[in-house]
From Swiss-Prot:
Keywords: Chaperone, Cytoplasm, DNA replication, Metal-binding, Repeat, Stress response, Zinc, Zinc-finger. One of its GO terms (cellular component) is cytoplasm. It comes from Pseudomonas syringae pv. syringae (strain B728a). HAMAP family: DnaJ. This is Chaperone protein DnaJ. The gene is dnaJ.
């Protein structure tokens, strides 16, 4: 099968710059690399094709020969340039595109810091703190126990036995990176001996085995301000994992999770609750006590109250953590139908029902609904 035009393979114009070629190649290689597409022969062939095209077009002399003579100008069997060394196994995926991924993800683990080698910031930690609604609304002080990594005391975080110190890595010369030739690529990789630190420990500390850090659980006091809600974060600066090679300590983020309440539901600064009332109180009106976070308050129920009616108790909600006035407590009435009636109670209700017959003024919604039903069926 005839080879495709190399510019077509990369999806660029013939006059494209070296930067455009590189950008197009990386996009294709990231998409079709075998590490991303295992057992996908089609992607493997596209990756090889992109490698071949980029090797030629990224080399000024090969590109000139290709532009003048086409594939014949770079085909060794026809007296052209050298062969292709990339192939599907050419360069390591993570090494070729490490700088691309650094742009996407900021490099390394979330909360880490610094470049390769040398001092690196410790990772940030996350701790989920469960609170009940009252604690979240009023604020509280809580002691938490957090597992973390701290500097090893015997070696003071160096990883080397007392009396010794880390030495410059002979493999990378202290840079933390080595340059390797893989196919037609020359790529920079993390030094396999010092793992990017630039130094090695020839006599490791017995306590941390050369790591410079050890696991430890810390007890911390967390001051929770009033008004927090699920998802709010409290940052404890410097309470994360210890850094390496003398790097700064990370932070601890305490993430709030407020448990469900038996009575109240929260929406921002407002609270909601359902208040059951008897149908006699709903019909005749009355006064009842309802709970709030500050204690019980009296709520006046007017006569003729229907299920779903909502009453607002101003200022009985939550004062937001970021300031502002307290929200309201919204009490939604739910009229209960009586059950387990005595004989006398049933008789009274029967009398009451009889007294309502043919008098629609007592149930305006019901009468209106029935009228609507009649019109509906009359239109069919």
């Amino acid at each position: 099968m005839a080879k495709r035009d190399y510019y077509e393979v990369l999806g660029v114009e013939r006059g494209s710059s070296e930067a455009d070629l590189k950008k197009a190649y990386r996009r294709l290689a990231m998409k079709h690399h075998p590490d991303r597409n295992p057992d996908d022969k089609a992607s493997e062939e596209l990756f090889k094709e992109a490698n071949e095209a980029y090797e030629v077009l990224s080399d000024a002399s090969k590109r000139a020969a290709y532009d003048q003579y086409g594939h014949a100008g770079v085909d060794p069997s026809m007296g052209g340039g050298g062969g292709f060394g990339g192939g599907a196994g050419g360069a390591n995926f993570s090494d070729i595109f490490g700088d691309v991924f650094s742009d996407f993800f900021g490099g390394g683990r979330a909360g880490g810091g610094g470049g390769r080698g040398g001092a690196q910031r410790g990772s940030d930690l996350r701790y989920t703190l469960e609170l009940n609604l009252e604690e979240a609304v009023r604020g509280t002080n809580v002691n938490i126990r957090v597992p973390t990594l701290v500097n090893c005391k015997p070696c003071d975080g160096s990883g080397a036995k007392k009396g010794s110190s880390p030495v410059t890595c002979p493999t990378c010369g202290g840079i933390g990176q080595v340059r390797m030739q893989q196919g037609f690529f020359s790529v920079q990789q993390t030094c396999p001996r010092c793992h990017g630190h630039g130094k090695i420990i020839s006599d490791p500390c017995d306590s941390c085995h050369g790591e410079g850090r050890v696991e430890e659980s810390k007890t911390l006091s967390v001051k929770v301000p009033p008004g927090v809600d699920t998802g709010d974060r409290i940052r404890l600066s410097g309470e994360g994992e210890a850094g390496t090679q003398g790097g700064p300590t990370g932070d601890l983020y305490v993430v709030i999770n407020v448990r469900e309440h038996a009575i109240f539901q929260r929406d921002g600064k407002h609270l909601f609750c359902e208040v059951p009332i008897s149908f006699t109180d709903a019909a005749l009106g009355g006064e009842l006590e309802v709970p709030t976070l500050d204690g019980r308050v009296k709520l006046k129920i007017p006569e003729g109250t229907q299920t779903g009616k909502q009453f607002r108790l101003r200022g009985k909600g939550v004062a937001p953590v970021r300031g502002g006035g307290a929200g309201d407590l919204m009490c939604r009435v739910a009229v209960e139908t009586p059950v387990n009636l005595s004989k006398r109670q049933r008789e009274l209700l029967e009398e009451f029902r009889t007294s309502l017959e043919n008098d629609e003024s007592h149930s305006p919604k019901a009468s209106g609904w029935f009228e609507g039903v009649k019109r509906f069926f009359g239109d069919l």
